[in-house]
Amino acid sequence: MVAMIMASRFNREAKLASQILSTLLGNRSCYTSMAATSSSALLLNPLTSSSSSSTLRRFRCSPEISSLSFSSASDFSLAMKRQSRSFADGSERDPSVVCEAVKRETGPDGLNIADNVSQLIGKTPMVYLNSIAKGCVANIAAKLEIMEPCCSVKDRIGYSMVTDAEQKGFISPGKSVLVEPTSGNTGIGLAFIAASRGYRLILTMPASMSMERRVLLKAFGAELVLTDPAKGMTGAVQKAEEILKNTPDAYMLQQFDNPANPKIHYETTGPEIWDDTKGKVDIFVAGIGTGGTITGVGRFIKEKNPKTQVIGVEPTESDILSGGKPGPHKIQGIGAGFIPKNLDQKIMDEVIAISSEEAIETAKQLALKEGLMVGISSGAAAAAAIKVAKRPENAGKLIAVVFPSFGERYLSTPLFQSIREEVEKMQPEV
């Protein structure tokens, strides 16, 4: 998206710039000192090339890099005027916690262009939840993994597991066949990496996963084998092991057991959350699927501050970590029905069970009230975070919660069933 505002008078420019930044950044602005440039426009352009001007600073307001230029220093000062946000306890915070200036490395040609798609993974933004968090005494900030290249947190482990196996000499492009059981998002994360590096990929997935996921996987060239939905991820794992035995040069990445899974979150996701909150995160909330996100992030944050609470989320219908039994549920991506080896249970202070219905309803409300189109597991994580944020003992605290995937790949699921039925019945107006 490119937005350019031209005006004849710089006061009007500054006012418009402030309004646009306010809207785009949720009434929180990026700011820094900047020398005036020769441009008479405000330019917001993701992934623009580096400017030749030494006075131009680069900003991070989203996963992309944006360029900001103003006709005068006073324009910039006015448009970038600091805004403060009140915590639930009445204190105020510096808005730089939300938007951080960064300097991106450039190639030998000086252009700010990634060499390949894997370089776009990570450094996702965080955003406060507002309307949906009414009645909460703590603040909730969502880590938007929906803004990864393929719109899910699993992009990170797709990259890390393939890269790790390559570095150890286990696989090589054009020869090895990658095999993996998946609920969908890990498969997509693997599929775009496999496509970019030249691997054949075979995925096994419960038939209960969304149609959008199937289409996406096939679009990337992956081979897809559906398994009995009643057997959950256990059935997908068993089928993958069978394929592994019968396929020459096959290699299973084993997301549930692979240390490269939590490692990438320890090395990237955790530090990103810590840096974006300036170490002020009090509670971390994440769904439990493979265990990689909560284990990796939890370890990093606990090392930085042992007092930080780490809270996991699982489906009520399959609450094995809470002492229940595995069972079918509608929260795709969490609640595998078994305890993954990658899950460090000692890192968690609490596990909250959220029903499929509550997860779906919360995901709907995130779209309607926050403008965030997220998947069902994001709804589950948000529902748990809201419960925690309403506890009196958490007044004034900052809760970070991971939103794992984008909602568009759930259009065929119960999440949007009523809307889908409504639009299918729509007729053109005469």
Swiss-Prot record:
Disruption phenotype: No visible phenotype but displays lower levels of thiols in roots. Growth retardation. Defects in root hair formation.
One GO location term (cellular component): mitochondrion
InterPro entries associated with the record: Cys_synth (IPR005856), Cys_Synth/Cystath_Beta-Synth (IPR050214), CysK (IPR005859), P-phosphate_BS (IPR001216), TrpB-like_PALP (IPR001926), TrpB-like_PALP_sf (IPR036052)
Residues that bind pyridoxal 5'-phosphate: 185, 289-293, 377
Taxonomic source organism: Arabidopsis thaliana
Entry keywords, A to Z: Amino-acid biosynthesis, Cysteine biosynthesis, Mitochondrion, Pyridoxal phosphate, Transferase, Transit peptide
GO BP: cysteine biosynthetic process from serine
Gene, per the UniProt record: OASC
Enzyme Commission number(s) of this protein: 2.5.1.47
Enzyme type, top EC level: transferase
Function: Acts as a cysteine synthase. Plays a role in the sulfide detoxification in mitochondria.
A single MF term (Gene Ontology): cysteine synthase activity
Catalytic activity: O-acetyl-L-serine + hydrogen sulfide = L-cysteine + acetate
Protein name, per record: Cysteine synthase, mitochondrial
Main localization, broad class: mitochondrion
Subunit structure: Homodimer. Interacts with SAT3. Component of the cysteine synthase complex (CSC) composed of two OAS-TL dimers and one SAT hexamer.
